[in-house]
Regions:
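C-terminal-of-GTPase-core extension/linker across diverse P-loop GTPases
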Residues: 1-52, 173, 177-250, 256-257, ...
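Conserved C-terminal guanine-recognition region of P-loop GTPase G domains, centered on the G4
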Residues: 62, 70, 74-78, 110-115, ...
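Switch I (effector-binding) loop of TRAFAC-class P-loop GTPase G-domains
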Residues: 36-37, 234-237, 259-288, 302-307, ...
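Conserved nucleotide-binding/hydrolysis micro-motifs of P-loop NTPases
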Residues: 57-61, 92-94, 126-129, 148-151, ...
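Switch II of P-loop NTPase G domains
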Residues: 27-43, 67-71, 94-111, 275, ...
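Short alpha-helix plus adjacent loop in nuclease-associated cores
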Residues: 148-167
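N-terminal accessory targeting/assembly segments
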Residues: 1-146, 150
Length: 449
């Protein structure tokens, strides 16, 4: 079987014989040297892809914010199994309509990619189909934008049939407008009537039709899954439903495991949870259902929001939301705003909400952002105040917010009993309002505290 090489020059094969021997001499030279060595060994491990990151922020954006966004993009790349080698930043009033970055920056990226043998370039924004084609033609490596990277991570995380269908639908919707020029054979024609002389149907038309048919099939399948999920949720009548919401990687699954004593997958990576998980919990004879839902993120692809309708219905139909925030993250306030905006988009922003700040054990009020190599045109915010202490934040948020606020550490189990007590009070109050005859031994006095 012929070996296929990707755009970055790496070779992949199903054979256990690696393209390069373990004497650190890669490629054809390494194979020739290995032939002369009967004791030569081969590294059969799958090589991780390497990438550079590219961001085009507004000229007024502070450097600390730009770095924060690139840190998140690097975390996404790491979650997808990619090693990030370098970061490129170009400040423009607006991205170049043809190649997103300017001509000089594109030449700089190309020189670095060729010199280091990089296999992928990842952009922190969505690229148009024409920009994608122009960049691939110029850089001759794989080009990935933010949406495709997130969709790829979702594809690796999805376990249930519903989640897999949702991700596949998002993939096809992303692919459809980008079919032109995707394969070299698309200029050929297929068909042409009985005499084979007509213009026929070009392969691009055929491929588009195949993708559209697949999208229609997946939408029908998801409608069936929605009906099943709706039936399951209807069968949960008579019990209060609570949903954990928040930015990705804030510790929702860890909290879920603590409260429900279950074993939901939790990992220090983005989008560890894609499938929603529901557990029945009872505190002080007050039963309720707790849902762990998919995390939100800045610039979450609209296709994913649309595709994950049935999963997000767990949030829409919840009686109480627990908004979990990673207080150790320097941009946690922006993350709160992103989650609130996404809740508005899915029409769930008007629900009762508890705000829970997690990871207080990792909070550092004097942490300064370290500068990364590869930045140019620095635009530092010299007037930015020092981060407040944890005590100052507690006083501030407890004073200015009407909703209850709690500060915890799920990892270190700090203030978890307080979280249980807070949940119990609010769930019991909702339960008493809706189902006054089903609270068992829980007293009305406790509910009304």
């Amino acid at each position: 079987m012929a070996k296929k090489s990707n755009a970055g020059g790496r070779q992949h094969t199903n054979s256990t014989r690696h393209p390069g021997a373990t004497d650190n001499i890669p490629g054809r030279v390494g194979r020739l040297l290995a032939k002369g060595n009967k004791d030569a060994t081969y590294d059969t491990a799958v090589q991780r892809e390497t990438a550079v990151l590219v961001a085009v922020p507004d000229k007024r954006q502070a450097d600390a914010r730009t770095q924060e966004y690139l840190d998140e993009l690097a975390f996404l790349a790491e979650t997808a199994g990619v090693d990030v080698q370098h970061r490129f930043v170009q400040r423009l009033d607006k991205p170049d309509i043809r190649t997103f970055v300017g001509e000089g920056k594109l030449a700089e990226i190309k020189a670095y990619v060729m010199h280091k043998g990089i296999s992928m370039v990842i952009f922190d924004d969505d690229l148009s189909p024409s920009q994608l084609r122009n960049l691939e033609a110029e850089l001759t490596v794989k080009i990935v934008d933010r949406s495709l990277l997130i969709i790829d991570i979702f594809a690796t995380r999805a376990k249930s049939a519903t989640a897999r269908a949702q991700v596949e639908l998002a993939q096809y919707q992303y692919l459809l407008p980008r079919l032109t020029g995707l394969w070299s054979h698309l200029d050929k024609q297929r068909g042409g009537g009985v005499s084979q002389r007509g213009p026929g149907e070009t392969e691009i038309e055929t491929d588009r039709r195949v993708v559209r048919d697949r999208i229609a099939l997946l939408k029908d399948k998801l409608k069936d899954f929605d009906k099943q999920s709706h039936t399951q949720r209807k069968s949960r009548g008579g019990i209060v439903r609570v949903a954990l919401v928040g930015y990705t990687n804030v510790g929702k699954s860890t909290i879920m495991n603590l409260l429900s004593r279950s074993d939901v997958f939790a990992e220090n990576k983005l989008f560890a949870t894609v499938d929603s998980t529901v557990r029945k919990i009872s505190f002080d004879n007050v039963p309720f259902l707790l849902s762990d839902t998919v995390g939100f993120i800045r610039k979450l692809p609209t296709r994913l929001i649309e595709s994950f309708k049935s999963t997000l219905d767990e949030i829409r139909e919840a009686d109480l939301l627990v908004h979990v925030v990673d207080i150790s993250h320097p941009g946690f306030e922006e993350q709160i705003a992103v989650v609130n905006e996404t809740l508005k988009d899915i029409e769930a922003a008007d629900k009762p909400m508890l705000l829970v700040f997690n990871k207080i054990d990792q909070y550092r009020h004097d942490t300064e952002m370290e500068k990364q190599a590869g930045f140019e045109g620095m635009n530092e915010d010299e007037d930015a105040p020092q981060r407040p202490t944890l005590a100052q934040l507690q006083a501030t948020y407890m004073a200015k917010l009407h909703d209850p606020v709690l500060f915890i550490s799920a990892q270190e189990r700090e203030n978890i009993d307080e979280l249980r007590a807070l949940l119990t009070r609010h769930v019991a109050k909702l339960h008493y309002q809706r189902y006054p005859n089903s609270l068992g031994d829980f007293s009305v006095e406790s509910v009304e505290e």
